[in-house]
Amino acid sequence: MSALAAPGLSAIRDSLRCPICAGRLELTPGALRCRQRHTFNIARHGYVSILSGTNAISGDDAPMIQARERFLATGAYEPIRRAVSTMVSHTIPRDGIVLDVGCGTGYYLAGALDKVTGARGLGLDSSVRALRVAARVHERAAAASWDVFRPYPLADQSVDAVLNMFAPRNPGEFHRVLRPNGSLIVVRPTVDHLAELRRDVPDSVTIDVSKEQRLHDALAPFFEQERDQHVGYIAEIEPQTARDLLGMTPSARHITPAEVSDDDLPERVTISVLVSSYRLRET
């Protein structure tokens, strides 16, 4: 893919940094390159292969990503995306940069960019299959392979919002890359989320009851909570949608969704998540 075919990358290139030498990255035909000649190829699917070689990790596989695409296409999580997009629109300038850490297919990032006309986005994920989708999810979005637990290939104070949607988090890096007036937006499930699915298909989706306290403990040194919104509703789902819901989660690694009978699947599920925004704490 040529530089001219990567408008999303071009729009956020000033924020990018070489993960090897921390130098600025320039967009060249088919690659990002720093002055030290460290080069990161742009895959034909449009994402940048920054994480490679011995540092590469796998992430979600193709069946999980396909299940996620099908499930999200039903609109079952659209109220969550709207809540996130609205929160983003209240916190960033029109031409701001949104970083989606653990972006998956870029579903939430695309929603935020649709809401804030002129905003630009970057999604980071370790799954090549997910990045193939995320790189093309929006004309103002770019995508790059990265391990979210490592220092991000971004300059200090270079983004206006960080999205953390049901994904692992790195509070220190969130804090480093956010601008002083930037916001961190975190989405996580409550104990009621997918209650019917967890009841009918034991050992499928698990929710850690201590997750909220651990989130607070992890973020407290770096952030102060600003807004907290509960998004809750009942979603009617077909058997295949329920299987896709199983298949897009880590439960797919020890459950074969296709082998779960219709009789064992709920016809409706409770959707219950918290959407919170955080401001930087002085450190």
Where are the regions a protein language model picked out?
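Conserved SAM-binding loop of SAM-dependent methyltransferases across substrates and taxa
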Residues: 105-117
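Class I SAM-dependent methyltransferase Rossmann-like catalytic core
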Residues: 57-83
